[in-house]
Design a protein with these regions (language model features):
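Non-cysteine beta-strand/loop elements that form the S-adenosyl-L-methionine
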Residues: 1-7, 65-68
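Glycine-rich, proline-tolerant flexible connector loops at the mouths of alpha/beta enzymes
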Residues: 4-18
């Protein structure tokens, strides 16, 4: 994996290193041209599936989408298989929450804390009605001692109600 941004080891914070040094996608593309048999994946600043597809179309073997996929998984991860590979359908965030329940329950039974998982679920509904209330319920409820699946249920109910209210006003 080649990161298209050169990190500056002195003078910049980690956050500044994600923004200030320029991205050099052409360098990665030139590397692939020069070493066509080498498996190269590109990383750095890629935020959309269209960008990813563009690199794949130009011969790059793989594309890493980091923060964008984490913060808005419904727009990136759930659509990757159908849009990039032409397989399956986009995952519905509500179905993702349902599918996560057994994993969450097992984690809690093993002594884990809800917030250790729920913090990674905050972006599931980004851009959809009720996303803010979903995040608030998880952020406030999950860190509480003994928090369990009831927090997920309450967040989902509140989000669904907010979504219905929004639909009624349209």
């Amino acid at each position: 994996t080649v990161h298209a941004r050169k990190a500056w080891l002195q003078g910049l914070s980690p956050k500044e290193n994600r923004d200030i040094p320029p991205l050099d996608y052409d360098l990665v593309l030139r590397m692939k041209d020069r070493f066509p048999n080498l498996h190269l994946s590109i990383n750095g600043g890629i935020t959309t599936l269209d960008q990813a597809q563009g690199f794949l179309d130009r011969g790059i073997d793989g594309v890493m989408i980091g923060r964008a996929a984490y913060h808005d998984p419904a727009s990136v991860l759930s659509r990757a298989d159908p849009e990039i590979y032409g397989q399956g359908t986009a995952a519905d965030p509500d179905n993702v929450v349902t599918a996560m329940r057994p994993y969450i329950a097992a984690h809690l039974e093993q002594g884990g804390k809800l917030h250790q998982i729920s913090r990674h679920m905050l972006g599931l509904f980004t851009g959809r009605p009720g996303a803010r209330i979903w995040r608030r319920h998880l952020s406030e409820g999950a860190p509480r001692p003994g928090a369990g699946l009831e927090v997920i249920d309450a967040a989902q109910t509140a989000r669904t109600e907010a979504e219905a209210t929004t639909a009624e006003t349209l």
